[in-house]
Amino acid sequence: MTRDVVRKARLSGERTEDIESLLSSMEADRNIASSDVLVDMAHLVMLTRQQIVHEDHAKTLMKELLCMYESGVPAEAFDPSYEDIHAGIETILTRKTGGDVGGRLHIGRSRNDEVATCLRIRTRDIILDQLEALTRLRSVLLSVAADHITTVMPGFTHLQHAQPVTLAHHLLAYEQMFSRDFDRLFDALRRVNCSPLGSAALASTGYPLDRPFTADLLGFDRILVNSMDAVASRDFAEETLACDTMLLTNISRFCEELIIWSSAFVQFVNLDDRYCSTSSIMPQKKNPDVAEILRSRTGTILGSFVSAITIVKGLPMAYNRDLQDLNPHLWRGITGVRRDIDLLAGMVESATFNRERMAEEAGRGGTTTTELADTLVREFNIPFRTAHHIVGKAVKDGSLDLVTLDRGAEEFYGKTLSSLGVTQKNIDSALSVSTSLSVRKLPGGPAPDAVLDALAERRKELEKDIELICDKKTQISASLHELLTQARRIAQL
């Protein structure tokens, strides 16, 4: 007969290996084993405080739980004969303390609310790690950008040369994208950090549990009030996967550019050797493998997100076992994201950007012709669309000298630019990269002064975000410290 204390009375007969394999969540539960011990401790502190469990029984149980907390969940608890880690831990506790003691830990609780609570604790911790990593990445981007205020390069649309920008301006675009990823994750954390504990199977319990108390001990911001929603909903997992999918999409876009920029025919950047590999046959190769794998990670997490949301979409209230199959997708999707962020930060920080090559390309491909058209509008009062036609015709004809522009002006405006006072000097000045950059000084533009202002503003925003994380981690740490203090008091250690 199975050793699982949950199963042995109601159900008889040994399960086949196939059934055990299908129903077991043990591998995925490795992610929440330590969280389960914390949940057990908080629940037991509350049961003792509410005089539901006698202090002597609580003392015996808490000693074992503290041992698990300090030494780690024993390998025996992960035996595949248990359906999940919760049954494994309870079985071991019952064996060590006896049925009269160990059997009291689960009073007023179901695995439904227990699992949901553990999932939220672990997801919360992962999100906080990701948020910290994002602040490091953003700090790197701001630091590298500060070194490249005047490093000119072409900006692209459709992967074609478009207008001159600076490397600093380009990097600030990504920093701003990653700041929104931070905002999304931090906002999601508000909905993740809610306690289902005390909801039991679906209809709460007749025991006088103190749900807000256990929520405080575990560092939650509040309880999930409706007990059915608390155990049946996994939108916190779906939302976290969605946020991380968008984050990795932004990482993928950046990596795509680094891959292109590091190619022999572009040569905008030289990636540090640590982030590259060579070929097993071609000795000259330096392949941007880390960037390529990071680019591919979007596909992995998108698959996890789609799988998770599809599992949930047809489930009636309240708990259904289908939800167990969501957990591996959650962990597969989100557990590697902090590493991905850190790798990108390291890759950017250690990269060498080729200022000369960027400058060579900055004025190629007609990148400054927009400024020429704008000059005709600003200084000579030509309608913009007409100026656009005049310059576009000159580009098509292959020359941007005054003679060629005059021909276009006569065709589209009925008079030459020369007759309006336009000189070759006006044209040459408008076509210079420095002019194109210097006039684009609106907030968020690539002009050096505008970039310096943006850097200062972004640093302020980053400092605020770092403070947000620090405050949240301090709050959670204080709660867990109080939990351990009360647990040790009960265990009289």
UniProtKB/Swiss-Prot annotation:
<dbReference type="Pfam" id="PF00206">
    <property type="entry name" value="Lyase_1"/>
</dbReference>
<dbReference type="InterPro" id="IPR008948">
    <property type="entry name" value="L-Aspartase-like"/>
</dbReference>
<dbReference type="GO" id="GO:0004056">
    <property type="term" value="F:argininosuccinate lyase activity"/>
</dbReference>
<keyword id="KW-0456">Lyase</keyword>
<dbReference type="InterPro" id="IPR024083">
    <property type="entry name" value="Fumarase/histidase_N"/>
</dbReference>
<dbReference type="InterPro" id="IPR029419">
    <property type="entry name" value="Arg_succ_lyase_C"/>
</dbReference>
<comment type="pathway">
    <text>Amino-acid biosynthesis; L-arginine biosynthesis; L-arginine from L-ornithine and carbamoyl phosphate: step 3/3.</text>
</comment>
<keyword id="KW-0028">Amino-acid biosynthesis</keyword>
<keyword id="KW-0055">Arginine biosynthesis</keyword>
<dbReference type="Pfam" id="PF14698">
    <property type="entry name" value="ASL_C2"/>
</dbReference>
<dbReference type="GO" id="GO:0042450">
    <property type="term" value="P:arginine biosynthetic process via ornithine"/>
</dbReference>
<dbReference type="InterPro" id="IPR000362">
    <property type="entry name" value="Fumarate_lyase_fam"/>
</dbReference>
<dbReference type="InterPro" id="IPR009049">
    <property type="entry name" value="Argininosuccinate_lyase"/>
</dbReference>
<dbReference type="InterPro" id="IPR022761">
    <property type="entry name" value="Fumarate_lyase_N"/>
</dbReference>
<comment type="similarity">
    <text>Belongs to the lyase 1 family. Argininosuccinate lyase subfamily.</text>
</comment>
<protein>
    <recommendedName>
        <fullName>Argininosuccinate lyase</fullName>
        <ecNumber>4.3.2.1</ecNumber>
    </recommendedName>
</protein>
<dbReference type="GO" id="GO:0005829">
    <property type="term" value="C:cytosol"/>
</dbReference>
<dbReference type="GO" id="GO:0006526">
    <property type="term" value="P:L-arginine biosynthetic process"/>
</dbReference>
<keyword id="KW-0963">Cytoplasm</keyword>
